[in-house]
Amino acid sequence: NSPFEEFAYAFQLTAAGVPTTYPRAIYMLGHRSTLPPEILDQRRYESHQHLSQPDGTPILQRERNYISIWGYWNGLDEVLAREDRIHPHCRGINADQARDQGHITPDEYDACYENMTRLLASAGLESPQLLGTHYLLTLLPDKTIQRNPDGLPTVRLCNFEFLRPIGGAPAFAENSVPP
């Protein structure tokens, strides 16, 4: 996915109530890309060709590299703003790390995967290559994992690279407008 598609998916998921890391900015580097264009997936350029910047240049250019800037997950912003001086911060830990470090069991790991798959589907998306490194759990200051009311670890998507709408339609169809 292009950085613009990743941000669009993050906004779509957030609007659907699916927790994600916070998209902050997309930056186009000033220098030309050194990657040969033939190694890149060209579909992103085709799906974005009708979208342009105010000066008329395409928003996504083959000869440029882009950096996506995401918020660092260390707890809910509203909690951090209120309790920053009182409590230490939470920390994001991916599901693989949480399992490998003994914070969750293998069964809980599988439940987290199923939960993330279900959350994505509830928002009309899927990830055919979903990995445990693609979503975060929250490690609380007391070194326990934050849990839902049902006792399962809460999950927050942090990798949008392989997301797609269920059925495979592109995020930026010809007549669509990015959020």
Predicted region positions:
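Catalytic activation segment of kinase domains across protein kinase-like and atypical kinase folds
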Residues: H31, P36-R62, G124-P178
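Short, glycine/acidic-rich beta->alpha junctions
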Residues: S2-E5, A111-C112, Q129
